[in-house]
């Protein structure tokens, strides 16, 4: 595992371990959910440090140089991309994530089933997410997303997306807490940590399971970074 972690953060730099042996185990553990379980265990390890008062959703498109599964052309990036939507707590720890989404879809594509799966997984781990603010930008502001949040006991805190609306919305004004929304910057900080892992900046993995497995390693390292730093001081 140490060799795989070093490979994804720094690239191959030493010749002591065969790259084919490292990739063999990485491929195996990506497909049998071992890396996903590693990430889940990292969440349970830091459970007492998590802050569930606010959850933050955001996404980032990754250029895919060699194509592969769930890869499609994205005009804004001017290339083939894929997307992933992690969910962080108020401190920026990654506690849930969607799977890989093709880059030709907007951020709200199939958002309802993605959120339902993420919320159910967090509840299965015993994470007390009920009552939390759910921060997301206007790209995720859909009726289904808000309804899903309410159904799972969360408070949707999204800037209103006025697309396709020709007149002012009637009825009660939507709940929106601007002070809470401003604190979602921690999600951007988390993406900066993810970008430190070279294998995630540009996608070379053709299989979704492998690219997602690389993310699980990064998520685990980010969640445990303060524990590892204290251990090796």
What are these regions (language model features)?
Residues 1-233:
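Short alpha-helical elements
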């Amino acid at each position: 595992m140490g060799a795989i972690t070093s490979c994804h953060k720094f690239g191959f730099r030493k010749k002591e371990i065969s790259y084919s042996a490292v990739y063999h185990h990485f491929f195996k553990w990506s497909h049998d959910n071992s890396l996903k379980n590693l990430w889940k265990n990292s969440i349970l390890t830091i459970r007492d440090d998590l802050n569930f008062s606010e959850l933050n959703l955001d996404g980032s498109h990754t250029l895919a140089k060699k194509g592969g599964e769930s890869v499609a052309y994205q005009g804004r990036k001017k290339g083939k991309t894929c997307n992933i939507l992690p969910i962080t707590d108020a401190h920026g720890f990654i506690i849930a994530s969607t799977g890989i989404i093709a880059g030709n879809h907007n951020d709200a594509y199939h958002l309802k089933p993605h959120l339902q799966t993420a919320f159910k997984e967090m509840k299965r781990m015993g994470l007390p997410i009920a009552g939390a603010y759910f921060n997301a930008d206007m790209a995720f502001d859909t009726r289904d997303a808000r309804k899903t949040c309410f159904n799972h006991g969360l408070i949707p805190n999204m800037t209103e997306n006025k697309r396709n609306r020709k007149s002012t919305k009637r009825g009660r004004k939507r709940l929106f807490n601007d002070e809470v929304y401003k604190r979602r910057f921690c999600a951007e900080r988390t993406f900066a940590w993810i970008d430190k892992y070279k294998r995630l900046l540009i996608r070379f993995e053709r299989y979704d399971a492998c690219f997602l497995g690389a993310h699980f390693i990064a998520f685990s390292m980010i969640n445990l970074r303060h524990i590892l730093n204290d251990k090796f001081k």
